[in-house]
Amino acid sequence: CNTAHAWRDEIVAAVTIPFISIIDESVAQAVASADGAIGLLTTPGCFKAGLYQQAIDTASRELVAQTEAELGETMQLIDRIKAGDKSADVEKGLRAITQQLVERGATAIIAACTELPLVLNQTMVSVPLTGSTDALAKKTVALALAEEPLPES
């Protein structure tokens, strides 16, 4: 869950292993995929916590945020995915929201919810799509294979 990163400091303090941030890895991958503004497809809770906004700002990129209505619709679609609904109707809803982000200037999109990749994929989006789960998995594998040094906690 991306929103769990709201407790990042507490998690890092409670464990002795390196902490890999799904937020940092997703933003790094999105930044590498396109030169312009980054669209954020997320839940209301994650958005209100400001987790991605801060990381995107640190990367010196503009954020294309969802409207309140889009956040609500995204949450409804995520709830449907959690209930096992991977229908064309859910796909259509996600396509519409991502297209709105593109129309407002997003040159890349971060799918910042671990349920989204169960339905949303690159073929559905006209700009580079970074799935937060995939970004975290890629970094974890690179660290496990010692292709990159472990992060400092």
Language-model segment annotations:
Residues 1-153:
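Non-catalytic structural scaffold of enzyme domains
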